[in-house]
Amino acid sequence: MTSESVTTPLASTLVDKEQAADHNDDSQEDISLGGSNDATSLSSLKAIRSENEDANETGQADRNDDVEEDPLLTRYHTACQKGDLATVKEMIHGKLLEVNKDGDSVEHITGLHWASINNRLSVVDFLVSQGADVNSRAGALHATPLHWAARYGYVYIVDFLLKHGADPTMTDDQGFNLLHLSVNSSNIMLVLYVLFSVVSKGLLDVDCQDPKGRTSLLWAAYQGDSLTVAVLLKFGANIKIADTEGFTPLHWGTVKGQPHVLKYLIQDGADFFQKTDAGKDCFAIAQEMNTVYSLREALIHSGFNNDGYPIKKWFKKSQHAKLVTFLTPFVFLGLAFALFSHVNPLFAIIVLFLLTLATNKGLNKLVLPSYGRMGIHNVTLLRSPLFSGVFFGSLLWVTIVWFFKVMPWTFADEPYTNILLLIVLLLVFYIFGQLVTSDPGCVPEETDHENVRQTISDLLEIGKFDTKNFCIETWARKPLRSRFSSLNNAVVARFDHYCPWIFNDVGLKNHKGFMFFITLMECGILTFFKLCLEYFDELEDSYEDRNQELGKCFILGHSDLCSGLRYDRFVFLVLLWALLQSIWVASLIFVQTFQIFKGMTNSEFNVLMKENKANGADGVSFNENFNTTPEGFAPSIELDEDNNNTVLAPVPGSTLRKPRTCFGVCFTVTGMDQWFAVVKETIGIKDSSGHNIYSITSKIPTNYGWRRNVKDFWLTSDVNAPLWRRILYSPTSSKALLNGTEVDYFKLYKLPVKEAEQGSDMV
């Protein structure tokens, strides 16, 4: 959201501004606000203008034609619009204008109105200090400066005016109060501010209605503003209140057809069979507004079929369905290995393909519907324990074939290697279980409204009240290096990445365990490979004793692998599958090690690469954080803190993703995409935008030199503990090392300062 100057001081300009939300293509004009038209049916739902609004605009245009502008007033209003504080002070102090008589002769629009609608906090501050009336009405809708600022989502102006006597309960001629206008702005930060600073204190009701009976939730649903809908529902907004035409929030949400809005409303218990005064339910509205697909998507996501009836669940508990998903790969892999071991490969491929389709269909139709539905993310196999089940099934088959086939043949010749593999397998099983159930470092959710208000106040004081620094889901301040996780429904401190192989996030408290896990996994695969070669050699000797000659195996020749393919294809296939896994595991170890040396997380590396591509495209930047900090505000903000947080900021285009191909999904799941990015970084290959990636990552704010970075990662902050304990144990609290000092990652709002000599130690 930008502070765009309104340079024409004519009241007719404001009529358009007052009647349209700047940040939404769908303003309140799109819903009838004037007298009801009984002849209007839902089949002709279009932009229905209020008779009163038409009259306001027509009359205003006529009046403006007859008004002779006062050059002095025009200069003053223009200065207020542009934030020219020097000119405003000169005119007020020079007695050229009186601060409470600075409105035009037609609609009495004051300098405070113009400064408010243009986010000119310095001018607003000065005018109020000179006695300007913060509750003066002006414009075609007789709105206050508070209304003008709220309509455009200017949080800092609204905050200042409220602290200096502005009345949040006042309404304009449309009957809109501060909460209605805040919702119309579609700035989630302003909505949160009003909810906690006004509604929570009892000054306004979250379900307050305008003259047409429309609540803030209804407006948000119509605008397709899923963020505001979610916050209002969390604040207790009533989903059953209907307007004067019998429309509930779900009805208007169906008109707009925003799937996320519909999901939130349906999950909160909205009745999709309820009819309007015209006798139409959501299904009829969806047909007429061509939003059937969105409604059906929301219904299926929420556990209903296309007709609105509950989908049959084969499992009473969500955990049982997840357990079936988790164990399915073990059975599937066993069948696949058996097929290729005993039947013709071509026939096995056909059967395996059909089996894959059947398994996918069965999981999607019979198992996934039993999952619990929370939030807006669709439940898919990619967001299920399926991949963690693939790993567990693979590990279990490796253990089975080693214990029952490989070990009996090789223990005599390789006793220590077998014991080593046993230890590694036990450790991998143990750490895997720990990682699946571990807390990655979730920052506690804030539920005390007083604490939330204080957090908002603190962020406003430093000009950082936006979605980058305040979590709109948990209502807590976001620490540096953190990220909100929809899986854990919490902000995860020092968030690294979501790992489908452990069905959990990797963060502050389990990152070190994850590194042990993948390292042991790679060691285990290599040890298993060595024992399998010994096993195949023993098989070859056994068959040679029986005078059975071994033929060539194409590219394998007369190697031990050929013996395995000939004499125990099942074990050979399990080994081949394990070796395939070792490729992406090795690349993951390489990527993670590189990022540890660089002192950054996987999430920070991704953001850095995306930011580079976005900046290299056309140099245009976009505000995705709902930040409305006025120009020149808060000069006391520390530059280091602001710069340190830039690598975590959302980047242009980060929400616009290209369609994923099957190959791309596989690369992402296995982490090979990260491997390619790191290789380019290591050897200094330029990216598609022509930037040298090394020059970008060399400026990472959390890079304190590779030695310091490695120590920060591998050592806990408990300096009194033995060294072995500091290395082997993961952080159990929110405290860890950063640049050699103990920091609380739950409250990390400023990074430790780099020493001058650390610059030469970078990697």
From Swiss-Prot:
The chain crosses the membrane at residues 321-340, 346-363, 384-404, 416-436, 513-533, 570-590. It is found in: Early endosome membrane; Golgi apparatus membrane. InterPro entries: Ankyrin_rpt, Ankyrin_rpt-contain_sf, Palmitoyltrfase_DHHC. Residues 1-320, 364-383, 437-512, 591-763 are cytoplasmic. Residues 1-11, 34-44 have a biased composition (Polar residues). Palmitoyltransferase specific for casein kinase 1. This is Palmitoyltransferase AKR1. The gene is AKR1.
